[in-house]
């Protein structure tokens, strides 16, 4: 199970913490980083157990779980840009009058109204979440869906993929198996996303690649590796330095 699945299957308290305990490991829900329980980690002369070291990892990498979550695509948070900004200011501990001055929004009472609106949104979310949990117990016909990558951008209908559909697409375009060559790259955008996410599994998370290394891996997949590489960057699966000297697999 990749970290996107772990993220979406985690409970509220686990998400607030930013990591889960899985067997003998502590797993980061934000990027999949794992630390072994029972091992003492040393950093700058200080010793940490696995959980404390994970909290340090989250703090150094993202600032906080709040900072990570607030930066997700609005299709995933359900927040408008305006609501997102207000939540950040509330989280910083600013008072209504200070926020009004900072944003130029109406008056302090206007900010209080926004607080009420967010509280109402929270109540609705709790009820909806409970309804969906109850629905899972009764709806035996719901298809298994492929989880949306946590770091996905421009989330739209392309991400509306069932597991059955995903398997059919991979079988069609990788006739000799997903570790073989791609039959063609001429396909609808939704299918491109499925195929590109599968190709991304050929890269190692956290490893830095030079362009020739990227090209060599993609040539094993498809002759027009330049087009595949470009799409992987456009779809946010690969990232690179501005000069193209280094590439790496983006966090999903």
Listing of model-derived features with the role each one plays in the protein:
Residues 123-127, 234-244:
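A short, conserved structural fragment
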């Amino acid at each position: 199970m990749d970290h996107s699945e772990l993220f979406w299957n985690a409970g509220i308290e686990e998400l607030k913490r930013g990591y889960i305990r899985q067997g003998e490991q502590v797993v980061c829900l934000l990027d999949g980083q794992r630390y072994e329980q029972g091992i003492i980690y040393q950093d700058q002369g200080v010793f940490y157990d696995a959980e404390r070291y994970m909290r340090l990892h989250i703090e150094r990498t993202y600032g906080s779980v709040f900072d990570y979550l607030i930066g997700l695509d609005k299709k995933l948070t359900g927040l408008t840009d305006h609501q997102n900004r207000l939540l950040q200011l509330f989280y910083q501990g600013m008072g209504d009058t200070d926020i009004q001055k900072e944003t130029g929004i109406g008056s302090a009472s206007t900010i209080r109204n926004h607080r009420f609106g967010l509280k109402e949104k929270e109540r609705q979310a709790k009820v909806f979440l409970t309804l969906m949990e109850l629905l899972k117990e009764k709806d035996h016909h719901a298809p298994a869906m492929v989880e949306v990558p946590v770091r996905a951008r421009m989330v739209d209908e392309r991400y509306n993929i069932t597991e059955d559909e995903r398997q059919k697409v991979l079988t069609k375009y990788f006739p000799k198996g997903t570790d073989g060559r791609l039959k063609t790259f001429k396909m609808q955008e939704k299918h491109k996303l499925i195929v590109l996410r599968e190709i991304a599994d050929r890269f190692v998370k956290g490893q830095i690649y030079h362009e020739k290394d990227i090209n060599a891996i993609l040539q094993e997949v498809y002759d027009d590796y330049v087009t595949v590489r470009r799409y992987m960057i456009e779809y946010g699966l690969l990232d690179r330095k501005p000069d193209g000297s280094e590439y790496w697999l983006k966090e999903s």
